Amino acid sequence: MMSKLDPPEAGRSALSRPRLIDRLASAAHGQITLVTAPAGAGKTTLLRSWLAAGQVPGVPVWVSLDAADRDPGTFWSYVLAGLDRVGLAVPSGEIEPAGTPVHLLAAALYGRAEPVLLVLDDADLLAGSEVPEELDFLARHAGSALRLVLASRGDPQVHRLRHRLDGSVTDIRADDLAATEAEAREIFALHGVTPSDECVRAVLRRTGGWMAGVTLTALAAAERLGAAGPGRGHDDRAVATAADADIADYLDAEVLAPLPPADVQLLSQVGLVEHVPGALAVELSGRPAARQALDDLGRRTSLLQRCRRHEDCHRMDPLLVRLLAGRRSAGSSRRLHRRAGEWCAAGDRSVDAAIHLATALDWPEAASALVNGYAVAHLSAGPQARRLLAVFSGMPPDSRGAQSAVVLAAVAVARGDAEVAAKQLGRAEELVDDVPPDRAGALALALAVAGAGLARLSGDADRAMEAR
């Protein structure tokens, strides 16, 4: 029992994070602080570091929760034991008929000059029980004598609206907990690895700053690549991807395994990309209520959030997207990407449509989406150029049709291969007559774009035209 009343011991990679410790110290002057993020985000480590730093506005009482604590009697027995341990024993008295001492505790705390800081780790395990309602009662009736700090993977269901109205709730979420470049570099240093600046940035892009991902990468780099890091013949990508298998295992065990099968199925169906529009989620899952299901899943797990700029959109962690991709069968993946591509094409999202269709290995349709969407130029310029080029670099050189040929030419131009570009442009021109009249204008523009690119590449427009 007593082990539940102590923060877990710090591991080798425990990192002091002054920016977040200061934020917690400030937040804890309010009545409720919610630290909400998925597994491995560093919630417990942060709270332990904060308590150790001594920046606590009150007497701290820590309780690590598990599923058995959903029972109110069990939960409050640990809280009372924690209070007793720091010399704040609640006077004995008549226990409420419900079997919980929450009313007695509120009365005992009310008016204390020094507040009690009740820290509950894994508070999401309380969701669906009576405990959140009782905690809400305690927070309201103990007044300023109680400060609640809840670490949770999802919404702990403490009723926050009434507290938000008076500004007494602070949220610290996954984006806040994400590692900065300086913090990632320090984690690597704890494992004896000195990565380059670009390597650190690559790790953060790949992990989204997720603390467990950064730590596993540093550990894998130290164990598998040698403590010297990339400076000893290991490139940045080798370091950034060193822990891919370990990260997948962690996510499988800590993130997906605890979820009901229906939730995992929904994530697998819609998690093709990081940003999932609500209508696309409905299309891919076949569930009219997919939006609401994703909202509920986000509240319970913090695995996805509403996109900031577009209300009808959910954002999923890139690590989770990669894990889900690895779990799908090839056939299932192609079906989902083809359906997503068709949906995007119908909504004039040409680049997204092309990427989905190419991922489904439906090359003629992928090329058609680029050409008919007047998006061939995006292979060489624009925010999607790198992603498009990576996808279309796998396009077979003999893909059928004029649209495929002109896209292959544009890919070759982007890669600096004038010979292949000229060959594919010539093939596209030979097939022009096979294109329906209503698509001829889009193809002509694509030919002009690829031809101009070839001319710039060769440095001689006349020579480029002759090569065609």
Language model segments and positions:
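C-terminal helical "lid" of AAA+/P-loop NTPase domains
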Residues: 136, 187-190, 201-206, 212-226, ...
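Alpha-helical sensor/transducer elements of the RecA-like P-loop NTPase core
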Residues: 3-7, 16-20, 45-48, 77, ...
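Walker B catalytic acidic pair
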Residues: 121-122
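Extended alpha-helical scaffolding segments used for macromolecular assembly and cargo binding
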Residues: 326-411, 415, 420
